[in-house]
Structures are given as C-alpha cells and as structure tokens.
C-alpha cells in the first residue's frame, strides 16, 4: 500500500516537473519566435525602405527624363509649326501670283474667244458665199450644157470612176507582171535560205532486221526442242524468225509490221544476253519488250514535239509520231523526213511572215498516216487526215496533210509550203535509197516508156533516174511533134511509175548534113595534067 502511494506520488511529482519543464520550453520557444519575428520585421522594414528609396529615385529620374522628352517634343513641334507657317505664307503668296496670272490668261482667252467667234462668223459668211457661187456656177453650167445638175454630177462621177478603174488596172497589171517576173527568183531565194538555215543534219539510223546469236548453244536454246521455243516467239511477236542459211549466227526477223519487228528484236536481244531461254522467260521478255517499245514510241513522239516547239499535242498523236521512227519510205526514215519537212516549212514560213509554229506542226504531221497505213485501210494521206480531224487539229494542218500529194486543193499558203518542203526533203541527194534491183528496174521502166513512142531512136535514164533524155529521128518528127512527145512521156511516167522527187524529161532532135568538097576535083585535075604531059 505504501509502495503504491510512493509510486503515485512519484508520478504526480514527475507530472508536475514535466509540466514546469514544458512551460519553460514553451516560453523559451515563444521568446525565440518573437525575436525571429522582430528580426524579420526589422529586415522587411529595412528592405521596404530601400525599395521605397530606389523607387523614389527611379520615379524622380523617369520624371526628369519625361519632362526633358516633352520639352524636346514641344520644341520640335514648335519648329515644325514655324516651318509650316512659313510654307503657308509662301503658298498664299504663290496663290496670289497664280491668281494674277489666271486673271491675265482669262483676259487673253476672252480676247481669243472673241477673235475665234469673229473668225467663225467670217468662215460661215465665206461658206455661204462659196455655196452661192457654186450654185450660180452649176446653174450657169447647166444652162450652157443643156443638162441638169444631177446629170452633170453623174457624168463627172462616171468619168472619175472610169479613170480610177483604169489606174487601178494598170497598177494591178504592173504588180502582177513584177510578181510573175520575180516569182521564181523569190521562191528560189526563200527555198535556198530555208535549206541553208532550216533543217539540221540528223544521223541516219539503221533499222536492224537481224539478231546475232553468239554460238550454237544459244541457237539451240532459241529453237528449242522440236522448234517449240522459236514457234512460241513467232506466235507472241507475230513475226517469222529465219536463220540465214549460210550463217547460223544470224537470225533474220521477217514481218511487214515494223513495231512487231522491233518487239521481236528487243526480246531476242535480251534473251541472248541473259542466256536463260525457256518458255516462261520467252513470255516474260516479250511482255517486257512490248512495254519498253510502247514507252519508247510515246517518249520519241514527246521529244520530237518538244524539240520542234509545235505546242501541246494529243498523246495518241505523239505515239503515232514515235511509230514513224520504225517506218521507212524509199530507204528514208519517215520520222527524220517529217522532222526535216517541219524544219524546212518553219524556215520558209518565217521568211514569208506566216505562223511558224503552225507551219512546223503541219510539216511534222504531213506523213502521220504512214505510221499505221499497214494496219488501216486507205492511203497514208487519207489516214493522216482522218486522225488529224479526230484529235482536233487546226483546219490549216488538216488541209496540208490532205493536199501535200495534190489529192485535194490547197486552201492555205502553209499547205503549199508543206508540199514544197516534202519534195525538197525527198529529192535531196542521199535522202532516199532503194535496192539495186529496184533501181535498175526503175531505169529500165523509164527507158521503156520512151522507147515505146514512135519516132524515138534511143533513150537514156541518167542522173540516177532523175533525168530521161530521148533522142528522136529528125526525119520522122518535127519540132512540134518532139515537144508533144516530151509531154506525153512525162504524163505516162507520172501516171504509171512511182518515183522519189522529180524527173526531168529532155527530148533531143538533131539533124546533121555532111558534104565533102575538093578531093575528087583535085584527082581529076591531076589526071588531066598527066595526060597532057604524056602527050
């Protein structure tokens, strides 16, 4: 019991002591906090006073600066106002001077206006007097001539019209005579100038009809077992593939379609290069070749159109132009021929003052029908005209295509230029070529037409078939008949033969008389002298 009391007493004492200690600590902490608060307040007060002092100084400085700027601005405005006032005074002075001048000019104008009114009145009076004099003259002339005024006017007008018509006819005749006299010279100058500066020399491309096979192994692969591969190639390309009999390394591609020939050539070249030849490879290479050739057709057409600067053209027409690259006529590449015709036509049009772009366009498209004349029925002129109309070409271009061989009438000067450029391009030396057999047959056909005519002694085709000379029998044909013979032969050549350029037909009629004088008489004279001497 005592122990319990001691424990409780100890606890109470401990609580009292803890309370006292806690109160003391709390008082110490409170004092520390109060001291810290006083320090913070003092520091804040000092900082605030510093800021107030700084702000006051800044404000005073800004105020002074603002006052100075206001003073400067006021001074500037005062100066500006003074300058404006000076200008105003000068303007007022100038306006005063202008007012004086205006008053002077107004007075002068009033005087001139009055003078003009007086002059106009005088002119009206003079016109009235002239009209009265004219009326009196007409009445006097009518009385003297015995005709009225209207009849006299009609007579004068008729005489004047007759004189003007006569002068006009004389002037027109002089112009026509001058044009006729100089037309050939002018035309030669235009053509010569165009041929010198117009067409560019383009390399003559050779179209390959063969593919070289490097060895017998590749040859066997191309033929295939029982000819399977070569028959597949012929079926897919639409061509006939023939190995040259005496040269097993040369494969000849036979077809009338130049595009198919090119597809077959490209496919075979790729197969030979890859050395992998099977049915699948053949089909793949033929498809690739068709795609590449079709793309090259469009690309060639686009480059040609762009290079000649003929403007926008339908893609189908550009593809047809590309097809001309693989078409030849008398050995001349039709695309190069068309480019040359376009350049010549444009050059001549420039010298004559016509539309050069339209001229080059007509020249480029004039042989368009040759691109597909082996696929579509009709002449290349008809086909080209139809496609030009289909794709909305200009009427001048359509007429130039239709008329460049004389099938229809030429309705524009550009059509004449296209026909002339076509003839120049085809007739120039080296432009066209033909096989030896065709060349000899053409010469023989020319000579046969001449030799079949009555009165012809002999004939010769010279200048590579560009001239035919006919020698006639003078005792059978006179000069008139010889001229008629020349015309008849020219007409037969034009109607029966196909020839590049133009052919000159010359008929020669020559009569020679020979008589010998002197030898027989001298012999007889010598015999008489000998007889006299012997006697």
UniProtKB/Swiss-Prot annotation:
Its EC number is 3.1.-.-. InterPro entries: Diverse_Catalytic_Enzymes (IPR051094), HD/PDEase_dom (IPR003607), HD_domain (IPR006674), HDIG_dom (IPR006675), KH_dom (IPR004087), KH_dom_type_1 (IPR004088), KH_dom_type_1_sf (IPR036612), Ribonuclease_Y (IPR017705). The keyword ATP-binding does not apply. It is a single-pass membrane protein. GO terms for biological process: mRNA catabolic process. CDD domains: HDc, KH-I_RNaseY. GO terms for cellular component: plasma membrane. It is an enzyme of class 3 (hydrolase). Residues 334-427 form the HD domain. The chain crosses the membrane at residues 1-21. Keywords: Cell membrane, Endonuclease, Hydrolase, Membrane, Nuclease, RNA-binding, Transmembrane, Transmembrane helix. SUPFAM superfamilies: Eukaryotic type KH-domain (KH-domain type I), HD-domain/PDEase-like. Residues 207-268 form the KH domain. One of its GO terms (molecular function) is RNA binding. Endoribonuclease that initiates mRNA decay. Belongs to the RNase Y family. PANTHER family: BIS(5'-NUCLEOSYL)-TETRAPHOSPHATASE, SYMMETRICAL, SLR1885 PROTEIN. HAMAP family: RNase_Y. This is Ribonuclease Y 2.
């Amino acid at each position: 019991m005592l122990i319990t009391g001691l424990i409780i007493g100890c606890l109470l004492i401990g609580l009292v002591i803890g309370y006292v200690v806690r109160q003391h600590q709390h008082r110490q902490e409170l004092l520390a906090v109060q001291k810290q608060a006083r320090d913070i307040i003092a520091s804040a007060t000092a900082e605030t006073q510093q800021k107030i002092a700084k702000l006051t100084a800044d404000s005073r400085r800004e105020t002074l600066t603002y006052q100075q700027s206001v003073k400067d601005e006021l001074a500037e405005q005062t100066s500006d106002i003074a300058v404006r006032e000076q200008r105003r005074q000068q303007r007022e002075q100038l306006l005063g001077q202008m007012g004086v001048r205006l008053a002077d000019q107004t007075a002068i104008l009033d005087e001139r206006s009055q003078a003009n009114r007086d002059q106009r009145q005088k002119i009206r009076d003079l016109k009235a007097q002239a009209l009265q004099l004219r009326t009196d003259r007409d009445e006097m002339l009518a009385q003297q001539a015995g005709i009225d005024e209207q009849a006299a006017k009609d007579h004068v007008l008729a005489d004047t019209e007759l004189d003007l018509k006569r002068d006009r006819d004389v002037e027109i005749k002089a112009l026509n005579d001058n044009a006729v006299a100089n037309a050939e010279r002018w035309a030669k100058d235009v053509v010569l100038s165009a041929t010198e500066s117009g067409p560019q020399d383009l390399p003559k491309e050779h179209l390959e009809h063969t593919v070289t096979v490097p060895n017998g192994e590749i040859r066997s692969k191309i033929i295939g077992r029982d000819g399977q591969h070569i028959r597949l190639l012929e079926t897919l390309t639409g061509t006939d593939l023939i190995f040259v009999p005496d040269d097993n390394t040369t494969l000849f591609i036979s077809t009338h379609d130049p595009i198919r020939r090119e597809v077959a050539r490209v496919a075979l070249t790729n197969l030979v290069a890859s050395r992998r030849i099977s049915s699948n490879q053949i089909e793949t290479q033929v498809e690739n070749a068709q795609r590449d050739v079709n793309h090259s057709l469009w690309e060639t057409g686009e480059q040609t159109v762009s290079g000649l600067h003929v403007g926008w053209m339908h893609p189908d027409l550009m593809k047809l132009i590309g097809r001309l690259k693989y078409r030849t006529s008398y050995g001349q590449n039709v695309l190069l021929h068309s480019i040359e015709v376009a350049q010549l036509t444009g050059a001549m049009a420039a010298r004559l003052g016509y539309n050069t772009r339209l001229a080059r366009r007509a020249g480029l498209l004039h042989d368009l029908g040759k691109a597909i004349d082996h696929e579509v029925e009709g002449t290349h002129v008809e086909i080209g005209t139809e496609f030009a109309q289909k794709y909305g070409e200009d009427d001048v271009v359509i007429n130039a295509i239709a008329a460049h061989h004389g099938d229809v009438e030429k309705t524009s000067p550009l059509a004449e230029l296209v026909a002339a450029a076509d003839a120049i391009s085809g007739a120039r030396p080296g432009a066209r070529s033909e096989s030896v057999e065709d060349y000899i047959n053409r010469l023989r056909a020319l000579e046969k037409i001449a030799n079949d005519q009555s009165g012809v002694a002999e004939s010769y085709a010279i200048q590579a078939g560009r001239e035919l000379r006919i020698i006639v029998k003078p005792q059978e044909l006179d000069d008139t008949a010889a001229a008629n013979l020349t015309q008849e032969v020219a007409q037969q050549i034009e109607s029966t033969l196909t020839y590049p350029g133009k052919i000159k037909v010359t008929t020669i009629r020559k009569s020679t008389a020979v008589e010998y004088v002197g030898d027989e008489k001298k012999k007889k004279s010598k015999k008489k002298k000998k007889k006299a001497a012997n006697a």
